[in-house]
């Protein structure tokens, strides 16, 4: 994904907006998660490891992010896209957005067509997943403690 220069640029341009959670075993770095800190939100996006460690992904991507939010009184934690396993850990499904520029017109048309179908499928998926939400609902709104 990202090269060394990417991380150097992040550290120089937005050092106060970065949170990196690292995991070590026997004084060796074995994994890390990259988060972006907003005014009222923490955004988790990328993680990596050198091997397959039981529950390391959940610890570095979710549990440590939750602890950071509690400690720093951050109201919202968006741990990243995808993953049915997030529901059982207290997260609800939410829409995310992205922007892309596709120069080739035929490719752009094909992607737009696919995204139209995909967005309908995602909408249905979110509705299905919300049925398993750990939060009470009232008038189609999810009640959460802030």
Task: Spell out what each predicted region is.
Residues 76, 82-146:
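Terminal substrate-recognition subdomain of acyl/acetyltransferases
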Residues 41-105:
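Acyl-donor binding region in acyl/amide transferases
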Residues 3-5, 9-10, 16, 66, ...:
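Mixed-charge, polar/low-complexity N-terminal
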Residues 1-53, 133-146:
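A conserved beta-strand-loop-helix scaffold within acyl/acetyltransferase catalytic domains
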